[in-house]
């Protein structure tokens, strides 16, 4: 385990570690990916608008999420240090990496000596109804990056590293990562998640939200896992969100012109689900 401060820093170190370990310099990332705004993290983010000229590189290739053949074609070149993939893409609208795709990535990484990096910064720490979203597929990545939920708002990031990857003194470093206060916050969060069974609660409440709104007129698609849900609307999301906020005091995220992103607290219960469903139906 390597402790740091943020998701971007976690992904920077995950990618750096993969390159150190394999001696290779290329990275395979997914269309729609978001991994952070710093040097390597933004280079593997599929958004040229937030890449400064200094961040742009020819060492990253993007293939479509869940396209097994495209992934295999790239990795079989033997040039890649790592594949980095979000278990559930958040910024691009809650796009779930399929179980079959993640299993195929694991198989191909094993065959080609490539590191499998799972970015669980947003989809981890119970949000999907499992502690990590990739656990739905039953795979074991080489490196897992995480942040956000670790400190429940306090800046804590980390990467979990396979014991098969050799450690070397000085290979990774951080100024503030793993401070006493950060660790105290992380331990407190873990204690509450365990005592209140919040991972299972996320799964159950997520299923209830989906069941409550999936047949509402104007919903064209709904997807996700646990309390990480994307809702495609037949109308622009901006006006829909404005009404939810001004009339019902409910805030949601969004992606693109028509997608709501629902990421409520893991501790919500039936009362909050019913309140949201009632407001959603009234707004639709």
Task: Enumerate the predicted regions with their spans.
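Conserved N-terminal phosphate-binding loop of PLP-dependent enzymes in the Aspartate aminotransferase
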Residues: 1-284
């Amino acid at each position: 385990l390597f402790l740091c401060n943020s998701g971007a820093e976690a992904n920077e170190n995950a990618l750096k570690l993969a390159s150190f370990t394999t001696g290779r310099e290329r990275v395979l990332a997914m269309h729609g990916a978001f991994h952070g705004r710093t040097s390597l993290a933004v280079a593997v983010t599929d958004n040229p608008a937030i890449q400064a000229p200094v961040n742009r590189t020819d060492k990253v290739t993007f293939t479509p999420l869940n396209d097994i053949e495209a992934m295999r074609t790239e990795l079989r070149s033997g040039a890649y240090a790592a594949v980095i993939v979000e278990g559930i893409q958040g910024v691009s609208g809650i796009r779930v990496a399929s179980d079959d795709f993640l299993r195929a990535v694991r198989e191909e990484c094993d065959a080609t000596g490539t590191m499998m990096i799972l970015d669980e910064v947003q989809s981890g720490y119970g949000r999907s109804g499992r502690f990590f979203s990739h656990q739905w597929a039953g795979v074991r990545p080489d490196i897992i990056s995480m942040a956000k939920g670790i400190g429940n708002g306090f800046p804590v990031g980390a990467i979990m590293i396979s014991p098969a990857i050799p450690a070397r003194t000085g290979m990774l470093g951080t100024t503030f990562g793993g401070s006493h206060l950060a660790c105290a916050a992380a331990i407190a969060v873990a204690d509450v998640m365990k005592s209140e069974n919040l991972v299972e609660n996320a799964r159950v409440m997520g299923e209830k939200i989906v069941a409550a709104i999936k047949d509402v007129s104007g919903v064209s698609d709904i997807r996700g896992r646990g309390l990480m849900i994307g809702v495609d609307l037949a109308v622009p999301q901006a006006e829909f969100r404005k009404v939810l906020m001004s009339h019902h005091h409910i805030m949601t995220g969004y992606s693109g012109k028509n997608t709501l992103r629902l990421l409520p607290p893991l501790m919500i219960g039936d009362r909050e689900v019913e309140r949201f469903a009632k407001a959603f139906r009234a707004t639709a």
